[in-house]
Structure formats: C-alpha cells, structure tokens
Amino acid sequence: MPLYIGLMSGTSLDGIDAALVRCGEGRPEWLGATGLPFSAALHDDLLALCLAREVSFAELARLETAFCERQAEAVNRLLLETGTPREAITAIGSHGQTIEHAPNATPAHTYQLDNPSLLAELTGCAVVGDLRRRDLAAGGQAAPLAPAFHAALFTASEAYRLVLNLGGIANLTRLPPSGQAAPVVGFDTGPANMLMDAWSQRHLGHPYDADGAWAASGRVDDALLARLLDDDYFSRLPPKSTGREHFHLDWLTSRLSGHESPCDVQATLAELTAASIAMGVTQCSAGVSTAYDALIPCGGGAHNADLLTRIQRHLPEIPLTPCERFGWSPDWLEAGAFAWLAHQRVAGLPGNLPDVTGARGPRVLGGLYAG
C-alpha cells in the first residue's frame, strides 16, 4: 500500500509533527513519526501573526518561508529516522499553521500559513495542501476534518465509540458501529490546552503545565467556572468549530474578578476543559441507544494526568482507552489524519463528512502540487 506523510502544526504553536502512514485498503497503519519544535523566535512570531490584525506582505512571506523550511526539515528527519526512500512517498499532506479560522463570519474564511509549492520544491515530494477551504466553500465549517480519519481507524463493529483530541482546542468525534445508518458526529467542544498553556506561560514561564501538576495544586473557583461556561459557544449545537480567535487570554482575563490566585485559575481552566467535553458528549449522544465502549484520548492533553482524571470524573460510565491499544501513539494521530487526507485527495475520494462540518455534501479536499 502507498506511503504518505502527514504534517501538522496545531494551535499550541509548539512545532511540526510529522507522521509516516501506510494508506489504502483497510485501516491506516502508523509506521513512524517525529517532532521538530519551533525556535522560540519562530513561535513568538507565529503567535504574533495569529493575534495581529494587520501584517505586511513582506512579513507574511518571511514567516511562510521559515515555516515551510521547518516543515521540510521535519520531512527529511522522518525519512532518515524511518529509513524510507524519498521516492517511496506518494504525497505529503500539509495542514499549515492556522492563523485565523472564522467560518461564521461574512464572508466565511479560514487561513492557514503554508506554501505547498515551496514545500514540494524543498522536499522533492508531491504535496497536498489547502485542505480546509473546499469544505468552507461548500457551506461547511472546514473543521474538524479528523473525524473522517477517526472513522477509518477506530470504528467498532458493535459499539458506539468516542475519540477525543486534546490539542490547543478539544475536538470530539462520535463513531457509530459499522453498518449502522447513524452519522459520524464531530465538533470542537472548546479550549483544551490552549488557555492552560498560556496561563502557565504567563505565571510560571513554562510552555505548559507538565502532567497538570499546577492545576492539581489549586482549587476550582466555581463562580469563575460559571462565568467561563456562560460563553454562548458551549451551549451551541454542532456543527461548530472554534480556535484562538475566540478563546484567548483576553477572553479569560475579561472574566476574572482580579482576586483569584493563579493556581486556582489553572485548576478552573482544567475543569472548564473537562466540563465542556462532558457537555459535548451530551450534545452528541441524542439517539445513542447503547453504551459507549471507549473514550480514546489523543493529542498532548492525553499525557495530562490531572485533566484525564477530571474528564473521567465527569464521564464515569465511559472507559478511557489508550490510543496505543489500537496501534497508534496519541501524539501523532492528528498528523496521521493529514497523511490520510492526502491519500483521499490522490485517490479522488472525499475527505470531509458533511454531517460533521455542515457542508452541502462530500467533497474532495485540497490541491495537489507535483514533486
């Protein structure tokens, strides 16, 4: 079966994830992966770009080039570490770096910093890029796209199953048993690591709260939690998607009284993530007549013991099942999704699920740039 590489840089802005995946008949097979962090300067520049309302074309081109060069480095490292010849790669699926996602604006738009033409030149491989905007053009949210991949990878024969991606934003996928007419449901439940990381950076100087230890040392501020959960996004029914343009530090600080201790705020942010995920499970469970047999956490938050404990406390009836049980690492699942989406594009097959994104129908996603 053909080999693909998926490249992902999420809202955490911590670097490039690259996954080598065999795609074709049957379940996608993970063969290897590597991560390449951004330099502190590139991280800060990308964050500033995400928050900027104005930027020069020259600055945009500089950052796009630096980003693509880092992606090419990740591809080269992955090929070297896995012993894979370059000519064995059918295509690279490149997500790019989201700098704004506004599917409900007029006009709707989503922008990912990327240059598939340059990436093809730098790697010598075909590249599939611009994977979100066709769904948006068809009236969809352009996100999340991973649920179609989750369905190919995790669908069970007899039970409903949940996949939970804990990146900067939390994405939930509900998978019906194979052969059932029920649709796959997927959407963003709200912030996962994004606000916790930003708060940790501000008060501890650390890029993230390792294992959730700082959050575990604090107490949940119930009044603050209620103010946070009062945001309309949480009660909105899917399809829906969100990002840094909605959930950012200013959003948080505007809801603080000024008397909260930093560690209590961190605990409350962790509880916000867990509570909004539980709300999401309720929102997607209408019509589910059988128990879920698994909740599969993936992404960086899958290593946050405190966060997983909070999620399990909210959803005691659903067993948390490690991603590794299905032959995948939780760290590389999202990059793997973009390898699979590249396969779908090369094969001329749809990559979106209209029931997930709200698009008018299934669409072949992305453009193909020859190597």
Swiss-Prot record:
<dbReference type="InterPro" id="IPR005338">
    <property type="entry name" value="Anhydro_N_Ac-Mur_kinase"/>
</dbReference>
<keyword id="KW-0418">Kinase</keyword>
<dbReference type="Pfam" id="PF03702">
    <property type="entry name" value="AnmK"/>
</dbReference>
<keyword id="KW-0808">Transferase</keyword>
<keyword id="KW-0119">Carbohydrate metabolism</keyword>
<dbReference type="InterPro" id="IPR043129">
    <property type="entry name" value="ATPase_NBD"/>
</dbReference>
<feature type="binding site">
    <location>
        <begin position="10"/>
        <end position="17"/>
    </location>
    <ligand>
        <name>ATP</name>
    </ligand>
</feature>
<dbReference type="GO" id="GO:0016773">
    <property type="term" value="F:phosphotransferase activity, alcohol group as acceptor"/>
</dbReference>
<protein>
    <recommendedName>
        <fullName>Anhydro-N-acetylmuramic acid kinase</fullName>
        <ecNumber>2.7.1.170</ecNumber>
    </recommendedName>
</protein>
<comment type="pathway">
    <text>Cell wall biogenesis; peptidoglycan recycling.</text>
</comment>
<keyword id="KW-0547">Nucleotide-binding</keyword>
<comment type="pathway">
    <text>Amino-sugar metabolism; 1,6-anhydro-N-acetylmuramate degradation.</text>
</comment>
<dbReference type="GO" id="GO:0097175">
    <property type="term" value="P:1,6-anhydro-N-acetyl-beta-muramic acid catabolic process"/>
</dbReference>
<comment type="similarity">
    <text>Belongs to the anhydro-N-acetylmuramic acid kinase family.</text>
</comment>
<dbReference type="GO" id="GO:0005524">
    <property type="term" value="F:ATP binding"/>
</dbReference>
<comment type="function">
    <text>Catalyzes the specific phosphorylation of 1,6-anhydro-N-acetylmuramic acid (anhMurNAc) with the simultaneous cleavage of the 1,6-anhydro ring, generating MurNAc-6-P. Is required for the utilization of anhMurNAc either imported from the medium or derived from its own cell wall murein, and thus plays a role in cell wall recycling.</text>
</comment>
<dbReference type="GO" id="GO:0016301">
    <property type="term" value="F:kinase activity"/>
</dbReference>
<keyword id="KW-0067">ATP-binding</keyword>
<dbReference type="GO" id="GO:0006040">
    <property type="term" value="P:amino sugar metabolic process"/>
</dbReference>
<dbReference type="GO" id="GO:0009254">
    <property type="term" value="P:peptidoglycan turnover"/>
</dbReference>
